[in-house]
């Protein structure tokens, strides 16, 4: 099965598998079973075996999976050898936290440029990332395919349009707005308020006892 035909649910779990396998490799572990994987990443073992089956024979029955082989496979599949440069739009509290964190555990992802409208932030360097004025977006945004939005909701659509116009094809949207973009642009929405409300609702109405 071609990689672009892999179910999206499977594709979303691949970074989770990679992180755990990478940790095992750093610990010097040579092999791992689907049961061990299941307990660590909180995905049932049948789902893990099905996910892995899309890529052919990654393990052997009765032996499990070779950690070094799996690590090499996931590095290649997730393009860990290629650096993806990311732009951050909005250097407020959340944006600043992203700049300081800057995906240190992800070898292939780096925020390399940030934009904001606040003159007090423009021209500064936060976490090693230069901050430019939002009006410079078109001039400064070169060869960047991914952007993170941490701006007020009422600005999200206009900024998203500018990002698309200047070549961005993937947006991680932390604003409450559901931005409108062309069909060939991929947007992942993360609304922390909704996630928290959902958690509280499930705690009240779906007991795990």
Curated annotation (Swiss-Prot):
Extract the InterPro entries matched here: CoA-bd, NAD(P)-bd_dom_sf, Rex_DNA-bd_C_dom, Tscrpt_rep_Rex, WH-like_DNA-bd_sf, WH_DNA-bd_sf
Under the heading HAMAP family, the entry gives: Rex
Q: Which UniProt keywords apply?
A: Cytoplasm, DNA-binding, NAD, Repressor, Transcription, Transcription regulation
Q: What does this protein do?
A: Modulates transcription in response to changes in cellular NADH/NAD(+) redox state.
Its principal location?
Answer: cytoplasm
Asked whether the UniProt record includes Transport among its keywords, one would answer no
Q: Where in the cell is it found?
A: Cytoplasm
GO annotation, cellular component aspect:
cytoplasm
Coiled-coil segments on the chain, per record? none
Enumerate the residues binding NAD(+).
Answer: 90-95
The Gene Ontology biological process annotation of the record reads: negative regulation of DNA-templated transcription; response to redox state
Gene encoding this polypeptide? rex
Protein name per the record = Redox-sensing transcriptional repressor Rex
For this chain, the family text in UniProt reads: Belongs to the transcriptional regulatory Rex family.
DNA-binding interval(s): 16-55
GO molecular-function terms, A-Z? DNA binding; DNA-binding transcription factor activity
Q: How does it assemble?
A: Homodimer.
